[in-house]
From Swiss-Prot:
It comes from the Bacteria. The active site is at S43, K106. This is Signal peptidase I. GO terms for molecular function: serine-type endopeptidase activity. One of its GO terms (cellular component) is plasma membrane. CDD domains: S26_SPase_I. The gene is lepB. It is a single-pass type II membrane protein. Its main location: membrane. Signal peptide: none annotated. InterPro entries: LexA/Signal_pep-like_sf, Pept_S26A_signal_pept_1, Pept_S26A_signal_pept_1_CS, Pept_S26A_signal_pept_1_Lys-AS, Peptidase_S26. Pfam families: Peptidase_S26 (PF10502). Its EC number is 3.4.21.89.
Length: 264
């Protein structure tokens, strides 16, 4: 074997080692520190829109099987390690107890031991209603009009919620404006979507969410588009044709938007 071949082999090994190191670092960051998520639904509209790309922090609540595991069938341990208590008003990515194969993103409203009820769309926590003020309207990209409300939780966390606006004086949806009383069990939490009329949350089928099911705390939007580009069901030609309109659909105003800054 000549010297050129030896040097070539060393170069290949060095490049492979560098590549493997980068992959390992990326995996550690994804598993332990931060993970990006894409939001496919409008249950948090207009705080979070469809096709918003969310950056979330894994370390915010410590780690559980559902935050560390890449695959649903791998069960590393029970409970959480390095657990940190979530705060009321956090936007949380979690596994819903009724379908562990998917991820939900909602706003945390009720803590363990809380008594929660909605009366005429107003949230009552332990028999005290939160501050809620109508501040205007929001018209979605689909042309649907919403009433916009500013809500403040007992810990001072402020955010906006949205209700479908009346059409010719008729309220389109009033199904979940008044609820039964919910008593949040120990170790579990109560969630609502900011889009109150179009959210499958703790008022409906979701129920309470165990702390163990928390994956990460959503922090900011790092990218956003009006349409989806990648689709496993379409061919390469259609993907190429779809690339230009996808780029044109980028929502520049939403890039690097902090999810906890209330900008009126």
């Amino acid at each position: 074997m000549n010297r050129d071949n030896i040097n070539s082999n060393k170069t290949v090994k060095q490049e492979f080692g560098s590549f493997a190191f980068v992959i390992c670092i990326a995996l550690v960051i994804r598993i332990l520190i931060m993970e990006p998520f894409t939001v496919p639904t409008g249950s948090m509209k207009a705080t979070i829109l469809e096709n918003d790309y969310i950056f979330s922090t894994k370390y915010s609540y410590g780690y559980s099987n559902y935050s560390l595991s890449f695959f649903d069938f791998i069960h590393l341990f029970k409970g959480r390690v390095f657990a940190r208590e979530p705060e009321r008003g956090d936007i949380v990515v979690f596994r819903p107890p009724n379908d562990m194969s998917v991820r939900y993103i909602k706003r945390l409203i009720g803590l363990p031991g809380d008594k929660i009820q909605l009366i005429d769309d107003v949230i009552y926590i332990n028999d005290k209603k939160i501050e809620r003020t109508e501040v205007g309207t929001y018209i979605g990209e689909d042309g649907i009009k919403y009433l916009k409300f500013k809500e403040t939780l007992p810990n001072g966390r402020t955010y906006f919620s949205y209700k479908l606006a009346p059409i010719f004086g008729v309220i389109p949806s009033d199904r979940y404006s008044n609820t039964d009383v919910f008593y949040v069990p120990e170790g579990q939490y109560f969630f609502l979507g900011d889009n109150r009329d179009r959210s499958n949350d703790s008022r409906v089928n979701l129920g309470f969410v165990p702390f163990e099911n928390f994956i990460a705390k959503a922090q900011f939007i790092w990218f956003s588009t009006k349409i989806t580009w990648w689709d496993n069901d379409i061919g390469i030609i259609n993907l190429i044709l779809k690339l230009k309109p996808w780029i044109e659909s980028v929502r520049l105003s939403r890039i690097f938007k902090n999810l906890y800054n209330v900008d009126e």
